[in-house]
Every structure is written in structure tokens, then in C-alpha cells.
Amino acid sequence: MKFLYDLFPVILFFIVYKLFGIYEATAAAIAATIAQIAWAKITTGKVDNALIMSGVIIVVFGGATLWLQDESFIKWKPTILYWVFTVGLLGSQWLFKRNLIRGLMEKQITMPDPIWSRLNLAWAIFFLLLGFLNLYVAYNYSTDLWVDFKLFGTMGLMFVFVIGQTLLLNKHITEQDKK
């Protein structure tokens, strides 16, 4: 259910784009993200940092899209978000000696430190490349195709990446983790 909740603004963007256009879809994505932030605050009393970051980026880039009537800003939004994730993953590990991926997953699985470092690096590289791929699609194909890619392409790539990571990490997961 959380997966659909997290994808709500993207799915809404896709639907509204197909029905009305890029500017209406951008406004819907901004509203949906603000609603998500408000809902999280009301129901749990706290808002996840990634959601806050996504909210700031969609308001800034989506707002620029609407204000300037230039769709290139909204096309940059996923790339900026992915690159913020990249910087966060690498910066936290290299500057603060804190592995964010480990922090998210260590309650579920136990692995040696070097494996956690490689996993963190793999995610950082994945987000970096996904950002470049988003720009490539945005500027070399139609907006229609970019919108399709934004939902289905990135979700598909994420799914394949997670499956690949799971297969690679499986040999490092202890028997206790499998219980």
C-alpha cells in the first residue's frame, strides 16, 4: 500500500496529463504532493525527509513550469530528485560515515560492512544514471513518451534493479535473516 501511496503524485500526473495536458498535470502533482505531506503530518505527526525533498522540488520546478509556461522545468524535476538522492547517499557515507541504505534495511537483514558500502554505492550510481536517462528521454523524445517513461520506464528500471540487488545480496544474507 505504501508503494501506491508513494507513487500517487506520479500516477495522478500521468492520468491528468493524458486527459488534460502538461500544465494541468503539473498542478495536480503539486497539489497531490502537498496533500501527501499534510496527510503524513496529520496522521503520523511527522513527514519523511524524502517526501519533504520531493515536495520542495515539485513546488519549485512545477511552479516554474506553471509560472513560465515552460514544460522543461517539470522534465528536470525527476532528475534533480534522483541527483539529490545520489548526493545524499554518497555524502552521508563519505562525509558523515553513515550509510543511509544500511539505516533503512539493517533491521531486516545483516550483512558485512563492505557489502553495505557497495549497496549504498550501487544505489547512488543507479540514481545518478536514472537522472541522466530522464534527461535523455525528456529532450530526445516527445512529451507523451517522456510522461510514459516517467511512470512505466522508471518503475520498470527500479523493479529490475531491486530484483538484481536482491539476487546479488542473497548470498550475503545470514540464515537468521531468512527466518
Curated annotation (Swiss-Prot):
Major localization listed first in the record, in broad terms: membrane
GO cellular component, one term: plasma membrane
Keywords recorded for this protein, A-Z: Cell inner membrane, Cell membrane, Membrane, Transmembrane, Transmembrane helix
Compartment annotation: Cell inner membrane
Signal peptide: none
Coiled coil (UniProt feature): none
Protein name, as recorded: Inner membrane-spanning protein YciB
